[in-house]
Amino acid sequence: MSDITQRFRLDDRVALVTGAGRGIGRACALGLAQAGAEVWLMARTRDEIDQAAAEIRAAGGKAHTAVCDVTDTPAMRRAVAAIPVLDVLVNNAGFNIPEPFVEVSEEHLDQLLTLNVRAAFLVAQAAAQKMLQAADRKSRGGAILHMSSQMGHVGAPNRSVYCVTKHALEGLTKAMALEFAGLGIRVLSIAPTFVETPLYRKMAARPEFAAWVEGRIPMARVGQAEEVAAAVVYAASPAASLMTGTSLVVDGGWTAQ
């Protein structure tokens, strides 16, 4: 048998990561680069993606940046079109506004739906169009990875709109997987639990919230961004070549209950 560890490599592949400036997106960009991919980092904040790209280059990798708000569809389409070849999309940009269902404003509803669903859909569409331009796509392969959440599989208090958006991504994953299975492009979702990022640390400043989260996770801890990135690298690589239309749940057992 050939060296199976080589199936986890992404040499000669090009990946785009949205929301790549911090947290999970940044970890995914660095992880993909470590696996050999040439990485495009997309985010609204230049300083953050420039720093991440510099770290990749310092380690001997290839990185490019694209300053872009993915909710600006024309700008996003131009940015994706400017990538010469694309093999992997990590559709990561998204956010949450935790609040009780009866207090959700139309403004917050629209903000979450616009970024987490509409923009995610259109980014995936632009990426798929770019991938299909490659004449050898079926043999070369490709992967579109939607950053979902454990909240795309369950529900939770004060997260009604967020759950709506992540359940939508799970449905999109399955529908896209069926359309692209014969074209060489796999489509998967990555569904992490709460992950220790600057955003989580802000929420966990309330001891009762941190206790609730850790009490719900059978492994009794939140995730690390690198653990999510490891799942992304696997899902993007030939090691996952028979996987499509499903979700990699990285949740310490939350959804097993």
Please place each PLM-identified region on the residue numbering.
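Conserved glycine-rich cofactor-binding loop
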Residues: V14, G21-G23
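Short, small/polar-rich loop/turn modules that mediate ligand/substrate recognition or access, typified
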Residues: A181, R186, M243-G245
